[in-house]
From Swiss-Prot:
PROSITE patterns: RRM. InterPro entries: Nucleotide-bd_a/b_plait_sf, RBD_domain_sf, RRM_dom, RRT5_SRSF_SR, SRSF1_RRM1, SRSF1_RRM2. Pfam families: RRM_1. The keyword Repeat applies. Keywords: Cytoplasm, mRNA processing, mRNA splicing, Nucleus, Repeat, RNA-binding. GO terms for molecular function: mRNA binding. Belongs to the splicing factor SR family. This is Serine/arginine-rich splicing factor 1B. The keyword Ribosomal protein does not apply. One of its GO terms (biological process) is alternative mRNA splicing, via spliceosome. Transmembrane segments: none annotated.
Length: 245
């Protein structure tokens, strides 16, 4: 791609993230490969100047996808380079649930839990060891709009929907379906409506980062609408008006 970052109407910086500490031979396509799973990308502006380390600005169509990308890729090991991913300092003032975009070495706990929760909750069991919160969210989006998802060390997960009918549909259509993790592990999962709120779900799975390009960060994530699996993963700037489904 060529040209600068697209600057839309006020508030559009919520869709834009900074990516630093990139390897010197990085290409725009490589940056796309790191981030496309988080949502539709509007623009990638790669700065690769002589004598300085390359960096990039990635702009998503939806600010929620930008936030997911910051959570999921900050500190990610890309071929030996630990990426620095944050909101531009001139952009948004703070992340959801407290804390800002985060600087180098910022503890992840400062972000706090997502603020949006729902009573329309299902419990998922039988997840494979490599199953992440993002894998679970992607799988359950087929039933409707997911506002919260998390996974735990014992192979269970929790998913909350915006609407009751989406929760009901998830139990009816996604129970005993084949689940695939980002690492290719598959398992048949069970999906059941949660009863009275459990006292504690315990700790989320802690996964060590590896050099494999995986979405292993298991922090819970907030609202993200259902998304067609067949939709293009990257939209060039001339097709900026494509609507999300």
């Amino acid at each position: 791609m060529s040209g600068g970052v697209i600057r839309g109407p006020a508030g559009n910086n919520d869709c834009r993230i900074y990516v630093g500490n990139l390897p010197p031979d990085i290409r725009t396509k490589d940056v796309e490969d790191v981030f496309y799973k988080y949502g539709a990308i509007r623009d990638i502006d790669l700065k690769n100047r002589r004598g300085g380390p390359p960096f990039a600005f990635v702009e998503f169509e939806d600010p929620r996808d930008a936030e997911d990308a910051v959570y999921g890729r900050d500190g990610y090991d890309y071929d030996g380079y630990r990426l620095r991913v944050e909101f531009p300092r001139s952009g948004r003032g703070g992340g959801r649930g407290g804390g800002g975009g985060g600087g180098v070495g910022a503890p992840r706990g400062r972000y706090g839990p997502p603020s949006r929760r729902s009573e329309y909750r299902v419990i998922v069991s039988g997840l494979p060891p490599s199953g992440s919160w993002q894998d679970l969210k992607d799988h359950m989006r087929e039933a409707g709009d997911v506002c919260y998802a998390d996974v735990f060390r014992d192979g269970t997960g929790v998913v909350e929907f915006v609407r009751k009918e989406d929760m009901t549909y998830a139990v009816r259509k996604l129970d005993n379906t084949k689940f695939r993790s980002h690492e290719g592990e598959t398992a048949y999962i069970r999906v059941k409506v949660d009863g009275p709120r459990s006292p504690s779900y315990g700790r989320s799975r802690s996964r060590s980062r590896s050099r494999s390009r995986s979405r292993s960060n298991s922090r819970s994530r907030s609202y993200s609408p259902r998304r067609s699996r067949g939709s293009p993963r990257y939209s060039p700037r001339h097709s900026r008006s494509r609507s999300r489904t």
